[in-house]
Amino acid sequence: VWSQLLHVVNTFLYSFTNDYNAIQSNDSDDRIVVWVGSSGIGGRDQMQVLQQMVNDSFTPTYKIDVDVQLVSNGTLLPSALAGVGPDVAIQVENTLPMNYGMRNAVKDLSGFKNFDDVIQRFDQAAVVPYCFRNKVFALPDTYSFPMMFVRLDVMDSLGLKIPKNWNEFKDVVSELKKKNMEAGLPHDFNTFSMMLFQNDISVYEDDGIRVNFDEPRAVKVFEEYTKLFTEYQMQLTYDAVNRFRTGEMPILIADYTLFNHINVFAPEIKGQWTFCAVPETINGNVSNKTVTGTGTATVMMSGCRNAENAWTFMCWWSDTEAQLSFSRRIEAILGKSARYSTANLKAFEQLPWSNDELRAITEQRSFAKGVPEVPGGYMTSRYYNFAFLSVVNSSKNPVEQIRKYAKLIDKELEGKRLEFGIMS
């Protein structure tokens, strides 16, 4: 008892002098600094897992010290430009690597040793947002995509079948409305791009010369998509887990990671629900159930003091063994709801999924596609959202709105290409 009390007192006193943002520090020239964003795997539990893995595996094997630091989001680029950034940053938002790369803030990884082998660890769609004109500015950390969640018991009691395509989905929405019930569908850019992909329409022409939103087929897609929220009156905001748990929303489309939250926070409906591929679009005799994949990434900063050591860390961190170890430890500490959506394919397959769960996720992932990041592309999702809300909230004409904002997006794309000296 006295030894435990002494430990508590010492820990309390030490807390006044310990820097909890820097877990380990070493002045060696070979040392690398790794930043982790606080909204990614940030948090003391997760950081301790990463540091323990570095201490147990990475440093003894490669003789490279690692200073892991927890930082607030939004500090990466300003710090890098000020010359005080890290060597490596992990859990970086997927829209940032290409934009940082165009500003020479992160390194192109494609020329590093064994790059071609390392990149095979991931689904190629997961790499798409980090590439531009044969340059690769990041390695994927996490990767996720939407799936359809269904309350089997509720659907059965209503005499409804799981919809296989969007026409059937609309029919289900109509029937649910008659019972004062709802279906859930996100209205974000990733969902709209999914609709475009299912109609064989790319978001951009070539490598970002222009956006394809005003292409006639894309205009039609936008028009039909917004009808789900105007004519069918689908909700814009809702608590997915709670509405699904109560049965008020017996069918919804959401990121596959919602599976973990439902299992933890709604154990009373175990065995009464499932998840499967999203509805497909049927054009003639051709069906398409493509979804949009997204995630986070690891980057090497341009001001990196020792690129070889930084690359060694990135290879180790993205490898199957490290990703599986990290995933298992995090889940053991924080529970099933924190299951890590690793982008490493082999590590993902070894997580504690059932055969049916793994089969369903793997099938949907095979239809996942990444949205390319292009100079000026940060305005694409913003202007899409403006167009969507103007139709749904202000009853504006969908054709006019999507064409209007497509022109504004094109103007931004053109401006950024001129700024970076990119020839068409």
Regions found by a protein language model. Give the residues of each.
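Extracytoplasmic/periplasmic substrate-recognition and gating elements
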Residues: 266-339, 366-369, 386-389
